[in-house]
Amino acid sequence: MNQKIFIKTFGCQMNEYDTNRIYDAVKKIGYKKTENYEEANCYILNTCHIRDKAKEKVYHDIGRVKKSFRFKQKPLVIIAGCVAQAENQEMLKREPYIDLVVGPQAYHKINDMILDYQEKKKKKKKQSLMQFLNLNILVKLKINLERFHHF
């Protein structure tokens, strides 16, 4: 797996420490750090509730990421930190572009969360492909039946 991860850190010294913890964790599942968010497969915003307008900065940044990835594959978007912990469900409802929300107490689970998300995404793609193929087969059968019916 040649995946790249970018983490933008807002706020306090603790968040800088947590960002390094996250980088150390995701290395174990094949992610490499990048300084260029546009080449990332995984984009994490590590947030801080103490700083002014932290929540709005998150939504502003997500807007920037959406714009950058409009014509290429969307990265896995994760909101981490204390804003994520406090606003978990609200963030997911307000911004569907967010894939995962993880608070500081769950950083030890971040690899499992990422791998579970990727597995579910793979299954969903496979189901969509199967539905498309089944629909395509049914359309071909219908066309063949209509041709047969005209004789």
Where are these regions (language model features)?
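Proteins enriched for Cys/Gly/acidic motifs involved in redox and nucleic-acid/cofactor modification
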Residues: M1-F151
